[in-house]
Amino acid sequence: MKAVIILGLVLLSVTVQGKIFERCELARTLKRLGLDGYRGISLANWVCLAKWESNYNTQATNYNPGDQSTDYGIFQINSHYWCNNGKTPGAVNACHISCNALLQDNIADAVTCAKRVVSDPQGIRAWVAWRNHCQNRDVSQYVQGCGV
């Protein structure tokens, strides 16, 4: 019985960690999910965004005390506007998705929501990390050697 409990705890700790993508693995995944060139945004810009928002970590979260919202997942999608965490006051949930879905190792839901974010007039500029680290920079290094 102790062995079953210990095994359960070990598996739980592995699950909680989530997936941390390798750079090229993420580039290939984002390309397969249709982000390369989506709304005119290069694959390199998407990978740069993910690097600076979450360091390629699907389980990344960041609480924002000002509006009591939280950013979720590989793209750090915010609960005030885009997803529902059941806690953020006045949440919009424009992606019509649970914020927990943005923390999955399978990032298809996160990509779908990111596509919704960039369909707004602000586009990819909605992400502060993209503006601070990727905008008007040579981002080709983020897909270099990835064969994409």
From Swiss-Prot:
GO terms assigned for molecular function: identical protein binding; lysozyme activity
Listed PROSITE patterns: GLYCOSYL_HYDROL_F22_1, GLYCOSYL_HYDROL_F22_2
Domain of life: Eukaryota
CDD domains attached to this UniProt entry: LYZ_C (cd16897)
Keywords tagged on the record: Antimicrobial, Bacteriolytic enzyme, Disulfide bond, Glycosidase, Hydrolase, Milk protein, Secreted, Signal
Cited SUPFAM superfamilies: Lysozyme-like
Coarse class of the protein's main subcellular location: secreted
Residue ranges of domain C-type lysozyme in the record: 19-148
Active-site residues (renumbered): E53, D71
EC number: 3.2.1.17
Gene3D superfamilies attached to this UniProt entry: 1.10.530.10
GO cellular component, one term: extracellular space
Cleavable signal peptide: 1-18
GO biological process: defense response to Gram-negative bacterium; defense response to Gram-positive bacterium; killing of cells of another organism
Reactions that this protein is recorded to catalyse: Hydrolysis of (1->4)-beta-linkages between N-acetylmuramic acid and N-acetyl-D-glucosamine residues in a peptidoglycan and between N-acetyl-D-glucosamine residues in chitodextrins
Role, per record: Lysozymes have primarily a bacteriolytic function; those in tissues and body fluids are associated with the monocyte-macrophage system and enhance the activity of immunoagents.
Family: Belongs to the glycosyl hydrolase 22 family.
Assembly notes: Monomer.
Other known facts: Lysozyme C is capable of both hydrolysis and transglycosylation; it also shows a slight esterase activity. It acts rapidly on both peptide-substituted and unsubstituted peptidoglycan, and slowly on chitin oligosaccharides.
PANTHER family the UniProt entry points to: LYSOZYME C
Designated name of the protein: Lysozyme C
Organism: Macaca mulatta
